């Protein structure tokens, strides 16, 4: 059974114009917002991250991306579109951008090396040939953004990782072995990042499914990102992923 709520919008009826304007402003600013309507009293309000009796229910709806009823309240979810910023136009990135788009993400590639990030290798994709930290600042990052670093080159990966750690991205994954990550951790600590910051990094990247080929590693990355999005209580763990 499907329940559909239809509201007129006009003078003296339906949602207040100010509420709709505020909703539109939040959407434009990429702020997750729930439009809440009590179907008994027809009270209406917007729920973001401010304290509200429906906050817990709204947060659960944000994570599931599903609107629905909580008692007499209809909660309409307005989440910003998902984005994935991939640093490093390497072989793994080719299947990953396709999988990301199928999963509902807007993928963007960052690689200053034009021979790697070429239109021939990534037809129709958004490619920024800029230094990663500058590119990430230009693109902007928020709680609906996943960042994946794949270059295996600290000169390119580290600036992107540092920029991502200063943001609210919901996922940050980095290619490299456990040994590579240990060296990365030392560099980040020297740069002033604490244990809580560094613990946000998923490395070695990807779910531990024994992936070997670029496509398989892309699948493992997509699986891990999905888990982090849908089960935000999960924390990064070191795995035996063969991403040398």
Listing of model-derived features with the role each one plays in the protein:
Residues 99-105, 163-166, 189-190:
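Short, solvent-exposed amphipathic alpha-helical segments in soluble enzyme
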Residues 156-169:
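Rossmann-fold NAD(P) dinucleotide-binding segment
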Residues 133-143:
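Short amphipathic alpha-helix with an adjacent loop that forms part of the alpha/beta core around
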Residues 1-128, 142-145, 224-244:
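Segments forming oxygen-rich coordination pockets for charged ligands
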Residues 111, 151, 176:
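Short beta-strand/turn micro-motifs composed of small residues
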